Amino acid sequence: MITELHGIDIRENEPLKHYTYTKVGGPADFLAFPRNHYELSRIVAYANKENMPWLVLGNASNLIVRDGGIRGFVIMFDKLNAVHLNGYTLEAEAGANLIETTKIAKFHSLTGFEFACGIPGSIGGAVFMNAGAYGGEISHIFLSAKVLTSSGEIKTISARDMAFGYRHSAIQETGDIVISAKFALKPGNYDTISQEMNRLNHLRQLKQPLEFPSCGSVFKRPPGHFAGQLIMEANLKGHRIGGVEVSEKHAGFMINVVDGTAKDYEDLIAYVIETVENHSGVRLEPEVRIIGENL
């Protein structure tokens, strides 16, 4: 119990596999769930004062946490999840569920967020990764974000300063943490928006192994190629290391089929990269983030 942070939901030596989409990950020294920006600032100020490392996990969807876990503070934004509308501008806190946020936009007949209707994760993670699917991405609708700097300062970043690229944003280099973001949507027709979201979700269910734990799309799309196609051509569908295998349904996904570990994921990723490069000459680059310590 950290007396200086009394009243904040903080759990010691908490296994992170209970919170990640992959269902792998060792313990966090301290796992914190701030309810508001004040509690978040208190956690960061305490960690900085005590020279303890801290990081934000978001919804831990496109992420692998190593089996040794994470030292210091891990902060999850599950309770920072408010969504507000001001005209055609939607503002969401970083912990807001991305899929649920697209449903709110649909309910108010606002178009622009349809592409994200099936992407797991949080608003903060989506901005960090410039998440996208089916021709759309966060940068297309992004206006600005409030971020928390490593020193504990809160500032606003514009779309220009975010310097979005393919699965990239400037905060991947700066280390700033999104605490909320604003998006510019447009008036639309509820039925049209609903039909498009149903179509995209149907495609996702047909093509992606949603019935298994996974980290989503493992690799970035190499120029002129599709990662899943290259992996399939290298005869890697169904290849398994430990409890993790390349999905038979979509080779761009790796699924935790039975008691997989983070090491299984890392070993399989390395094997796929090497095998695909030997087969096609194309070196795949992981899209998934891998963090934490090995056992």
Swiss-Prot record:
GO terms for biological process: cell division; cell wall organization; peptidoglycan biosynthetic process; regulation of cell shape. The active site is at R167, S217, E287. Pfam families: FAD_binding_4, MurB_C. Residues 23-188 form the FAD-binding PCMH-type domain. Keywords: Cell cycle, Cell division, Cell shape, Cell wall biogenesis/degradation, Cytoplasm, FAD, Flavoprotein, NADP, Oxidoreductase, Peptidoglycan synthesis. Pathway: Cell wall biogenesis; peptidoglycan biosynthesis. GO terms for molecular function: FAD binding; UDP-N-acetylmuramate dehydrogenase activity. SUPFAM superfamilies: FAD-binding/transporter-associated domain-like, Uridine diphospho-N-Acetylenolpyruvylglucosamine reductase, MurB, C-terminal domain. Its cofactor is FAD. One of its GO terms (cellular component) is cytosol. PANTHER family: UDP-N-ACETYLENOLPYRUVOYLGLUCOSAMINE REDUCTASE (PTHR21071:SF4). NCBIfam families: murB, PRK13905.1. Cell wall formation. HAMAP family: MurB. Belongs to the MurB family. This is UDP-N-acetylenolpyruvoylglucosamine reductase. It comes from Streptococcus pyogenes serotype M28 (strain MGAS6180). The gene is murB.
